[in-house]
Regions:
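ASCE RecA-like P-loop NTPase motor cores
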Residues: 1-20, 25-28, 33-274
Length: 274
């Protein structure tokens, strides 16, 4: 079956408080430093405390300024399709990398390259790229990997020129990158982009929120990850004629309480769980 991203979650009975119901994640949910099936049942999740627009406004000190949210000029229901891997092993499991490579290969074949593969872990990206090189050689695809000596701007231009190539990138390729046209038809997100909680600045921010009686996960970690997720997905459709797929290889969007918030943050489009 197919479902649509961007649909509203079901409110819990009697939920009058706009605070998120996600709460603090369990230990296994916290971000770590280090063939077709049916869609999963809808998750129950109260509305997030802030919309993405309101969250950003508060972050820049403009929370009291009236906002205007303008509709997109793009027809995402026709231009974009979202795939979600429904059965991915935990990243700590020995079979995780094999499963990750399997799905990357599957979807890269589908579009014959023309793909961004976005990672949150630099070491994992390098290892996966190295293991997949024979696959790229077999298909005759160039693979550009961030951090291998080529400047970021040069790598991006080479990717645009070679219409059958793949680019593996981390943080800086999730945003501020514009590849209109058919050079990019596939964005693969390997993991939801939660910030590493032990970074000094992030840690200080989380501690400050908790000290003020807030929920560091619901008030900061989750909305920040959703914003970055939206930015990553946004690499795909840059003009009214662009078409392509987004692939999410992190089944937390299906089986964690907060996962529905990521799907709701996307434009309405067809979704298929694989």
């Amino acid at each position: 079956r197919e479902a649509a991203a961007g649909s509203k979650a079901t409110e819990e009975p009697g939920a009058s408080d706009p605070a998120p119901a996600v709460g603090q994640p369990s230990a296994e949910e916290r971000p770590s430093a280090s063939a077709k099936t049916g869609c999963q049942p809808a998750l129950r999740l109260r509305p997030a405390r802030l919309t993405p627009l309101a969250y950003v406004a508060n972050r820049v000190g403009a929370g009291d300024v009236p906002g205007l949210q303008v509709g997109s000029p793009f027809d995402y229901e026709e231009q974009m399709k979202l795939y979600v891997a429904g059965k991915m092993p935990d990243p700590r499991d020995t079979g995780y990398k094999d499963a990750l490579i399997h799905w990357i290969e599957h979807f890269v074949r589908l579009t014959h390259g023309k793909a961004f593969v976005l990672f949150t872990n630099f070491k994992l990206m390098q290892e996966v790229a190295e293991r997949m090189q024979p696959f790229f050689d077999e298909l005759g695809l160039a693979c550009f990997v961030q951090g291998t000596g080529m400047p970021r701007s040069t790598m991006l231009e080479e990717f645009k020129l070679d219409r059958d190539s793949v680019l593996f990138g981390t943080d800086s390729f999730w945003q501020g990158v514009d590849v209109p046209g058919d050079a990019l038809s596939n964005v693969i997100i390997t993991r939801l982009p939660f910030a590493v909680p032990d970074h000094p600045l992030i840690e200080a921010r989380l501690e400050d929120i908790e000290a003020k009686g807030g929920n560091s996960f619901g008030d900061f970690s989750l909305p920040e990850a959703i914003l970055k997720f939206r930015q990553g997905v946004g690499r795909l459709i840059r003009t009214q004629t662009d078409k392509g797929i987004v692939v999410v290889l992190d089944n937390r969007v299906l089986n964690k309480r907060y996962g529905q918030a990521f799907l709701e943050a996307l434009p309405k489009c067809p979704v298929e769980v694989v």
